[in-house]
Swiss-Prot record:
CDD domains: RecA-like_HslU (cd19498)
Protein name: ATP-dependent protease ATPase subunit HslU
Residues annotated to bind ATP: I18, G60, V61, G62, K63, T64, E65, D256, E322, R394
Biological processes, Gene Ontology terms: protein unfolding; proteolysis involved in protein catabolic process
Organism name: Serratia proteamaculans (strain 568)
């Protein structure tokens, strides 16, 4: 679990997301409160429930990007889902309980990787011994079994030294590795994924853990043996317990496009299996219930839920009242301005302009963006957003791709040249498209 302070979290998010300080502060405080809660005594800890967040803002302003970056910072089980993928219980489609099952699977994977990393040193020692056993087989007793507790021979020690120094990396050896589990592809109707997973697990267990001889270079064999030995050192039962504990205490669920499951005012009544029904199914998860997964029972009382939506044709008040009450923290994200677009093009780590420079650099073409050129690109993107559909920062991808089309096409033939993208270059390539609303609607 991350121990970063709210200021550190916001600073890290600033490296990738421009503006939207209110949203960054809200998620930073929520993430820090997870850590604060774990410092309380057990009785009080149980009473402190997470304050779920609803992020409201037009498309392309950074809602999903905040979720992506938060997942990397959280160091906790995290899953992002689209609200539109689910249907009410009893109808064809995914049920909302699958959110918690997927979150638990993510936690199992995360805890397994942590456990493997923790055991890596021991796994490397065991892998080294297995390779040395192939290079210099240990002495055997009268029954043909390897003798235990024998002193390492001088030859074995010499080979160990060579192995550690990489002198034997290219030597080929034959080793026994665990065969890949038997893969059984089962096609199941939507909503039956849990049954499919259980059947696949059953077939894999029936296959048993078979050893398969393989001829590999020592360098490759060592990597595979380390993974195999590290996996053996992981206790499956402990793994499940730790993963379920991590989900219950630190899990974070990000629900995108929640506005798409609102019942908009004035709509006719009747069955609405992918809207209000989904909201009612989400309620127990958000307020706290117990979900059955293949790894065990998971309580959702202390899982943090962050929902987001553009709310262009609906409003947060169109959510059912019970769900509104379970999302107490509201954060509005602002539409992006020309100045924001300018900053997006230059300030974030691996900004769009840096990406294009690096891509063209692989062909030996040197690209330079001037400040005036970047300003004109930002103005063009903002203008198209205003005159057609506002898709936020995603418009920059379209505009830049159009601007760089000729250079990208000719790059292999203009090796060694330098190209400066200034205001005149941008005007020559974009102004006609931007000015013609019909063209910009279809091309930009």
């Amino acid at each position: 679990m991350s121990e970063m302070t709210p200021r550190e979290i916001v600073s890290e998010l600033d490296s990738y997301i421009i503006g939207q300080n209110k949203a960054k502060r809200a998620v930073a405080i929520a993430l820090r409160n997870r850590w604060r809660r774990m410092q309380l005594n057990e009785m009080l800890r149980h009473e402190v429930t997470p304050k779920n967040i609803l992020m409201i803002g037009p498309t392309g302003v950074g809602k999903t990007e905040i979720a992506r970056r938060l997942a990397k910072l959280a160091n906790a089980p995290f899953i992002k889902v689209e609200a539109t993928k689910f249907t009410e219980v009893g109808y064809v489609g995914k049920e909302v309980d699958s959110i918690i099952r997927d979150l638990t699977d993510a936690a199992i994977k995360m805890v397994r990787l942590q456990s493997i990393d923790k055991n890596r040193t021991r796994a490397e020692e065991l892998a080294e011994e297995r390779i040395l056993d192939v290079l210099i087989p240990p002495a055997k007793n009268n029954w043909g079994q390897a003798e235990e507790h024998q002193e390492p021979s001088s030859a074995r020690q010499a080979f160990r030294k060579k192995l550690r120094e990489g002198q034997l990396d290219d030597k080929e050896i034959e080793i026994d590795l665990a065969a890949a589990p038997m893969g059984v592809e089962i096609m199941a109707p939507p909503g039956m994924e849990e049954m499919t997973n259980q059947l696949q697990s059953m077939f894999q267990n029936l296959g048993g853990q078979k050893q398969k001889p393989r001829k590999l270079k020592i360098k490759e064999a060592f990597k595979l043996l380390v993974e195999e030995e590290a996996a053996k050192l992981v206790n499956p039962e402990e793994l499940k317990e730790q993963a379920i504990e991590a989900v219950e205490q630190h899990g974070i669920v990000f629900i995108d496009e929640i506005d798409k499951i609102c019942k908009r005012g004035g709509q006719s009544s009747g069955p609405d299996v992918s809207r209000e029904g989904v909201q009612r199914d989400l309620l127990p998860l958000v307020e706290g219930c117990t979900v059955s997964t293949k790894h065990g029972m998971v309580k959702t009382d202390h899982i943090l839920f962050i929902a987001s939506g553009a709310f262009q044709t609906a409003s947060p008040s169109d959510l059912i009242p019970e769900l509104q009450g379970r999302l107490p923290i509201r954060v509005e994200l602002q539409a992006l301005t020309t100045e924001d677009f300018e900053r997006i093009l230059t300030e974030p780590s691996a900004s769009l302009t840096e990406q294009y420079k690096a891509l063209m650099g692989t062909e030996g073409v040197n690209i330079e963006f001037t400040a005036e050129g970047i300003r004109r690109i930002a103005e063009a993107a903002w203008q198209v957003n205003e005159s057609t559909e506002n898709i936020g920062a995603r418009r920059l991808h379209t505009v830049l791709e159009r601007l760089m089309e000729d250079i990208s096409y000719d790059a292999s033939e203009i090796n060694g040249q330098s190209i400066t993208i200034d205001a005149d270059y941008v005007r020559n390539h974009l102004d006609e498209l931007v000015a013609d609303e019909d063209l910009s609607r279809f091309i930009l």
